[in-house]
């Protein structure tokens, strides 16, 4: 991400979020994520089908969900029960929303639906590990910018070939507070256009390890995410695995 002056750098250098809280400031792990607010801690709850949310929160709606926005533009996430969710955003700042699991790990993740950005955004599997602290992305779709970094090779998985990249974030917000940490990326060479896909996470984790990109403990969440940056668009995703 530390490619000064590029759009890739700017997507992670977004304006200060509400209450000074970044999405990386979520305190993750085992379904006990909490969001600090001006009035205290908002603990995860249980949402119900067809609930639309516009404020930062985590919880359970058939599956674990996470929603974060820096407050720019108009952004909403609709929880449709089970593994389904949809998003709508207009002239957003930066946001990330998705459903998945309160802890990451080796899974065969299946998804279907659509991801329709006008501008910069990712359709991706997204998560964190601890000790070492790593932020990881497996990107199957993107908008106007395809993410890159220091090239580490390729991995073939689930009918596609992914380029592997590594980047570093310095003194940046994370699930463990402000720290310097690595980012690991698998970015599909061609977008998934069929509306459905499979991500076998272990194939990527193993390829990263072969490239010397060591992961840590899966203490934090892993979601099939929609992310947008200074863009508009919509998505409708159902995830299972």
From Swiss-Prot:
Q: What are the boundaries of the region Disordered?
A: 1-22
Gene Ontology biological process terms from the UniProt entry: xylan catabolic process
For the keyword DNA-binding, the answer is no
The record ties this protein, via SUPFAM superfamilies, to: Concanavalin A-like lectins/glucanases
Pathway membership = Glycan degradation; xylan degradation
Which residues act catalytically here? 135 (nucleophile), 227 (proton donor)
Domain GH11, residue spans: 51-240
Instruction: List, alphabetically, the Pfam families matched.
Output: Glyco_hydro_11
What sort of enzyme, by top EC class, is this? Answer: hydrolase
- Reactions catalysed according to its record: Endohydrolysis of (1->4)-beta-D-xylosidic linkages in xylans
Q: Which GO terms describe its cellular component?
A: extracellular region
Recount the PTM note: Predicted to be exported by the Tat system. The position of the signal peptide cleavage has not been experimentally proven.
GO molecular function terms listed in the Swiss-Prot or TrEMBL record: endo-1,4-beta-xylanase activity
Span of the secretion signal? 1-49
Q: Which domain of life is it from?
A: Bacteria
What Gene3D superfamilies does UniProt report for this protein, alphabetically? 2.60.120.180
User: Is Electron transport one of the keywords UniProt gives this record?
Assistant: no
Q: What is its EC number?
A: 3.2.1.8
Q: Which family does it belong to?
A: Belongs to the glycosyl hydrolase 11 (cellulase G) family.
Could you tell me what this protein is called?
Endo-1,4-beta-xylanase C
Which organism is the protein's source?
A: Streptomyces coelicolor (strain ATCC BAA-471 / A3(2) / M145)
* The organism's taxonomic lineage, starting at the top: Bacteria, Bacillati, Actinomycetota, Actinomycetes, Kitasatosporales
């Amino acid at each position: 991400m530390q490619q000064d002056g590029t759009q890739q750098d700017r997507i992670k250098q977004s304006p200060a979020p509400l209450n000074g809280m970044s999405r990386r400031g979520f305190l993750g792990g085992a379904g006990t994520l909490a969001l600090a607010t001006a009035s205290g801690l908002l603990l995860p709850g249980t949402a119900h089908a067809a609930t639309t949310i516009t404020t930062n929160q985590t919880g359970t709606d058939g599956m674990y969900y996470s929603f974060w926005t820096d407050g720019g533009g108009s952004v909403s996430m609709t929880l449709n029960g089970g593994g389904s969710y949809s998003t709508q955003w207009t002239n957003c700042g930066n946001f990330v929303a998705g459903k998945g699991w309160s802890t990451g790990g080796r899974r065969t993740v299946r998804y279907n639906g659509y991801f329709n950005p006008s501008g910069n955004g990712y359709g991706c599997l997204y998560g964190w590990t601890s000790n070492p602290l790593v932020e990881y992305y497996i990107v199957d779709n993107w908008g106007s910018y395809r993410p890159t970094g220091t090239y580490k090779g390729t991995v073939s998985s689930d009918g596609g070939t992914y380029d592997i990249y590594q980047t570093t974030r310095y003194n940046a917000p994370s699930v463990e507070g402000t720290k310097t940490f690595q980012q690991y990326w698998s970015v599909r060479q061609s977008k998934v256009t069929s509306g459905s896909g499979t991500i076998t996470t272990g194939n990527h984790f193993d390829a990263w390890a072969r490239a010397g990109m060591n992961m840590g403990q899966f203490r934090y969440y892993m979601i099939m995410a929609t992310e947008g940056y200074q863009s508009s668009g919509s998505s409708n995703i159902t995830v299972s695995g």
